């Protein structure tokens, strides 16, 4: 009997770890990980939050497209070799988030889920379907593959579940239930000492916007979104971070400079400005409390210009009248614009002069310090101008960054002049005609007729298939 008991103990001592291991892995199987609580269809919340929903829908009224390349063809040269040289429009209403990322020439004209120039990460700020997919597939699963893979999945415009925990009891009771629906944004806030779950409501209001209105890059083989805040949020901090990891978004096709492309760093620039330092949040200015027809207060989700709701926004703090404040803002905007153009002129020359140096036989060693100056100059310029509201958020910081960019561009051109002289080139390097977007695109070798034709074919053939598939899968309302 004792011998049988001993054998039984040995048996269970051997087999128990197996059952334990099996049970642990069973908890991590894909099937059990697919519990999804994110509802991406925004209209599902209309009955519960009618005022917020209708004001959110009104972002479709912000429909005008402004072609930034047509307005300023210099940009084509600065972004030569990068998709932004093909197409870059100024931002418009959130209701167009999915439409615009489909229609921009930057995303190409993929024919299959494995085709195209850009990664899945390019959907990350466009839709609550992103939060749903991350919950369903995990971050690694979501980021895996090309942008086109997400076409049939990411179909609802930026909305409720991007900013609110719509599955929570608080949300059901009419409370904001703010959340960071992107795990990478939560990690970034922790990196700067602002864990979301420990932040006050005012901080959370801006952190929610800071999930998308930030500088970011695509990290590693999987091209996962990461914010470059490990060293801090100032332009020099992020520059140091990128330099340390030897990161570049692309290589300028004229100067061969390893470049950085700033995105939309509103959170960083707001934080550096007087509003951010005084805890005036994004919501205070862009989503004020307004009254509905019955006199009930609600948060206006038609995100827009604070001057459109002056009494509910600016007038809460400022004693000046609307016209006076508009004049101040216009002057700051003009000052930033004027310096922006001066920096761009220097950078355009620097890119063509660098090309001339390469053509004249310059070596990598000779060009390295020059390209580093060009890289830093354009990065500082870009971080200033990519934040479209910097004249309001942090005008002093905008001018400081542009002034620094001007200095770096001047350093690059001085070094180029000396290097070109050693190659026997002492005359000014001529520029091609870049007076229009079309001429600038031709100067960098873009075949825009072909690019546009391919895009139109994609929009007519592939996108309808995406939407049909999304409806069949219940991701879009019929």
From Swiss-Prot:
Heme binds at residues 122, 125-126. It comes from the Bacteria. Binds 1 Ca(2+) ion per monomer. Binds 5 heme c groups covalently per monomer. Heme c 2 binds at residues 160, 163-164, 301. It catalyses: 6 Fe(III)-[cytochrome c] + NH4(+) + 2 H2O = 6 Fe(II)-[cytochrome c] + nitrite + 8 H(+). Residues 1-26 form the signal peptide. Ca(2+) binds at residues 215-216, 261, 263. Substrate binds at residues 216, 264. GO terms for cellular component: outer membrane-bounded periplasmic space. Its cofactor is Ca(2+); heme c. Heme c 4 binds at residues 282, 285-286, 393. Pathway: Nitrogen metabolism; nitrate reduction (assimilation). Its EC number is 1.7.2.2. Keywords: Calcium, Electron transport, Heme, Iron, Metal-binding, Oxidoreductase, Periplasm, Signal, Transport. It holds the Pfam family Cytochrom_C552. Heme c 3 binds at residues 94, 209, 212-213. Its main location: periplasm. One of its GO terms (molecular function) is heme binding. NCBIfam families: cyto_c552_HCOOH, PRK11125.1. Catalyzes the reduction of nitrite to ammonia, consuming six electrons in the process. This is Cytochrome c-552. The lineage of its organism: Bacteria, Pseudomonadati, Pseudomonadota, Gammaproteobacteria, Enterobacterales.
